[in-house]
């Protein structure tokens, strides 16, 4: 079964594009990845620090932000939000997505918890977010490969 993973954060310039780039970098067969934001401006690049901390891991992030739309929801098999607030907003706007929408932490480890927004912080805060995401994306990749 192909997986179409949609990562969602606020502005689609930090957390969700980092998560998407980390998962795409694994080049898992049968896994497609997109990202969007609940309050995103269309067409912005990923933040400078987000691109820098990905580059430290050898990952180039060619990304343009996108506002979350019905087409994203219809495309996705799994909608993975960065926070419970994002998850609640997604389900409120798109009730049909309820059964496929989770926080990333909930989906990979069954625990509640948000991924802190590094927006506007120093590069160390972005590194911490990247490292947390990297651990979660490793678990996500294992889960997807096990379920295929």
From Swiss-Prot:
User: SUPFAM superfamilies, alphabetically?
Assistant: Phosphotyrosine protein phosphatases I
Q: Which reaction does it catalyse?
A: N(omega)-phospho-L-arginyl-[protein] + H2O = L-arginyl-[protein] + phosphate
Q: Where does substrate bind?
A: 10-15
What happens upon changing residue 9 to A? Mutant stably binds to the arginine-phosphorylated substrate
Enzymatic class: hydrolase
Site entry (Important for substrate discrimination), positions = 13
Use in biotech reads: Therefore, this novel tool for the selective enrichment and subsequent MS analysis of arginine phosphorylation should facilitate the investigation of this highly overlooked protein modification, in particular in eukaryotic samples.
Q: Give the annotated active site.
A: 9 (nucleophile), 15, 117 (proton donor)
Name the Gene Ontology molecular function terms of this record. protein arginine phosphatase activity; protein tyrosine phosphatase activity
Q: Which InterPro entries match?
A: LMW_PTPase, Ptyr_pPase, Ptyr_pPase_sf, Tyr_phospatase_low_mol_wt
Record's family?
Answer: Belongs to the low molecular weight phosphotyrosine protein phosphatase family.
- What is this protein for, i.e. what is its function? Catalyzes the specific dephosphorylation of phosphoarginine residues in proteins. Probably counteracts the protein arginine kinase McsB in vivo. Exhibits almost no activity against pTyr peptides. Protein arginine phosphorylation has a physiologically important role and is involved in the regulation of many critical cellular processes, such as protein homeostasis, motility, competence, and stringent and stress responses, by regulating gene expression and protein activity.
Annotated protein name in UniProt: Protein-arginine-phosphatase
């Amino acid at each position: 079964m192909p997986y179409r993973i949609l990562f969602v954060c606020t502005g689609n310039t930090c957390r969700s594009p980092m998560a998407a780039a980390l998962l795409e970098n694994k080049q898992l067969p049968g896994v497609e990845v997109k990202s969007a934001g609940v309050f995103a401006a269309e067409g912005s690049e990923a933040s400078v620090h987000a691109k820098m901390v990905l580059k430290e891991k050898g990952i180039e992030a060619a990304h343009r932000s996108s506002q979350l739309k019905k087409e994203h929801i219809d495309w996705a098999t799994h909608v993975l939000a960065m926070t419970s607030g994002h998850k609640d907003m997604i389900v409120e706007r798109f009730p049909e997505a309820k059964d496929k929408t989770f926080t990333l932490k909930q989906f990979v480890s069954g625990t509640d918890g948000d991924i802190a927004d590094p927006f506007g912080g120093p590069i160390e805060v972005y590194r911490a977010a990247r490292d947390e995401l990297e651990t979660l994306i490793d678990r996500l990749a294992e889960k997807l490969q096990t379920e295929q």
